Design a protein with these regions (language model features):
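Short, solvent-exposed mixed-charge patches
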Residues: 1, 249-250
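Nuclease catalytic cores
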Residues: 2-152
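Extended hydrophobic/Leu-rich segments
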Residues: 1, 27, 155-158, 239
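Mg2+/Mn2+-dependent nuclease catalytic core
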Residues: 166-173, 178, 182-248
Length: 250
């Protein structure tokens, strides 16, 4: 049965009671009904993404991006010639936390993503509880014709068993807003951390294409995200990148 059907109310209350049996044991029938109404109300609110909520979320994500860039750069006060690396320094090689040889652009970008993801999780827990995912992977299910969320446990099991090839062609957006059902995606945001912040806004709006040999070669990440969104992106406005200083970039 579809979510929110005739059993939605009872199941929601039962789930709440399983999580806090002591509380439910003390509630009367009337109070239990009020709990169920509240849960149903929250579920209904997640079915849409109004402009006010979207604006608050995008502002919070932009602040997370700015915070991440500042926090990470402050870790390296004497590494670069100035407070921020120049283009040459961005291309120099270093070693990341896992012992891999990477450029400073890659290392800083990875560290900034980690900080931004933690910040986004905290902010969205308040702004849209139950209606978002951070760094969740999605894989296309050819049997159903839909994209399905891959749980962290399933992803880890595939990697540890040497079957990570099954994840080839999957998508992993930084932030997904959904209806409470992770498969029903309403909006997608990706953090982008250029090593050198450009003043050319037009350059930021260009999405890179997947390279030769990739399952989606020749397509852009935005095009694939639109497939993940399906009918929820008819306007083309539900996919954006979050860039330090610039904020939301479509």
């Amino acid at each position: 049965m579809a979510r929110g059907g005739r059993y939605g109310y009872d199941n929601s209350v039962s789930a709440a009671c399983r999580q806090n049996p002591a509380l439910c044991a003390a509630l009367s029938g009337k109070e239990l009904a009020e709990v169920g109404i509240m849960v149903a109300s929250v579920g209904s609110a997640l079915q849409v993404l109004d402009n006010l909520t979207r604006g608050s979320i995008e502002q919070a994500l932009a602040e997370c991006a700015d915070l991440a860039r500042s926090e990470v750069l402050l870790r390296y006060p004497t590494t670069f010639t100035g407070p921020i690396p120049n283009s040459n320094e961005c291309n120099e090689w270093t070693v990341d936390a896992q012992g891999n040889s990477v450029t400073w652009a890659m290392r800083l970008g990875t560290e900034m993503h980690e900080v931004a993801a933690q910040c986004a999780q905290k902010q969205l827990d308040t702004l849209r509880p139950g209606g978002f995912s951070v760094e969740s992977r999605y894989r296309y299910d050819s049997r159903t014709g839909r994209w399905k969320q891959v749980s962290p446990e399933e992803e880890r099991a595939l990697v540890e068993s040497g079957n990570q090839g099954e994840l080839r062609g999957s998508l992993k957006p930084d932030v997904v807003l959904h209806t409470g059902d992770p498969s029903n995606v309403l909006a997608i945001y990706d953090f982008k951390f250029p090593c050198v912040i450009t003043d050319d806004y037009k350059a930021l709006t260009k999405w890179d294409t997947y390279p030769t040999g990739h399952p989606y070669q020749g397509m852009t990440q935005k095009q694939m995200y639109r497939k993940l969104l399906g009918l929820n992106d008819l306007s083309g406005q539900n996919i954006a990148r979050i860039v330090p200083r610039w904020g939301v970039v479509p």
